[in-house]
């Protein structure tokens, strides 16, 4: 008989509770990502000086590039390659969720996906017989946060926390952004990609995802980044790039 042990059914918190919205925001129904990220997108459009129509073309072309990556990713949730026109055109199967985002510009969290990472010392990896050419080393890490209340942020068209964290993680690794071969930006909505690219100094027309992103690759809630890391680790192992 297995020696089953009874564990406490109450989860142990690993961080403090975070209040995400002010009463004034809630009163205006600004509480969920589908209401918040469209505000960021509108700010980015205004700063760029684009018309609504031109900006829809711009962000749909961005997401078409993500869809093209997903079409070649064997682990992607949606392998159909969408055109920019299909992504921006509102239809019965691509309804408007929160202007300016139709469904195909929103994170797809209705998925059944999982990913895992194994972290260990080099000594342990050697003892387990993992070939040396399969080892992937994390070089550095950093953590920063924008203000939880969006009404307290100075602007909606930039993300100082990402800029600071990105600069610091590169400093710790002794690299520049141009030294990074493989990039996967968080992509719950097009504005997240634009903000991340701008803050990190990345070309918006470059390949900014290795999975296809949260809409096409799949957006399993707060576990997406693990999928991105696992995908990049696999590509590093296969020699697609040296850094990611």
Short names for language-model regions:
Residues 224:
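Short glycine/threonine-rich catalytic loop with a Thr-x-Gly-x-Asp
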Residues 1-124, 130-217, 227-230, 234-237:
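Conserved "HGTGT" condensation-loop signature of ketosynthase/thiolase-family condensing enzymes
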């Amino acid at each position: 008989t297995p020696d089953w042990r009874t564990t406490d059914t109450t989860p142990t918190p690993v961080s403090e509770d975070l209040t995400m919205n002010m009463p004034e925001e809630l009163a205006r129904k600004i509480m969920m990502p589908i209401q918040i990220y469209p505000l960021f997108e509108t700010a980015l459009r205004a700063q760029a000086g684009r018309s609504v129509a031109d900006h829809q073309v711009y962000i749909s072309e961005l997401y078409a590039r993500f869809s093209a990556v997903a079409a070649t990713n064997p682990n992607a949730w949606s392998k159909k390659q969408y055109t920019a026109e299909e992504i921006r055109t509102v239809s019965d199967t691509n309804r408007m969720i929160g202007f300016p985002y139709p469904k195909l510009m929103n994170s797809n969290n209705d998925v059944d996906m999982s990913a895992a990472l194994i972290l260990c010392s080099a000594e342990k990896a050697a003892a387990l017989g993992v070939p040396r050419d399969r080892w992937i080393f994390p070089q550095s890490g950093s953590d920063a946060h924008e203000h939880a209340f969006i009404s307290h942020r100075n602007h909606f068209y930039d993300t100082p926390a990402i800029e600071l964290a990105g600069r610091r993680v590169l400093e710790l690794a002794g690299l520049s952004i141009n030294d990074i071969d493989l990039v996967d930006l968080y992509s719950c909505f097009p504005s997240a990609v634009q903000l991340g690219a701008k803050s990190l100094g990345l070309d918006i027309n470059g390949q900014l995802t290795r999975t296809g992103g949260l809409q096409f690759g799949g957006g399993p809630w707060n576990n997406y980044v693990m999928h991105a890391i696992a995908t990049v680790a696999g590509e590093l192992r296969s020699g697609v790039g040296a850094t990611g």
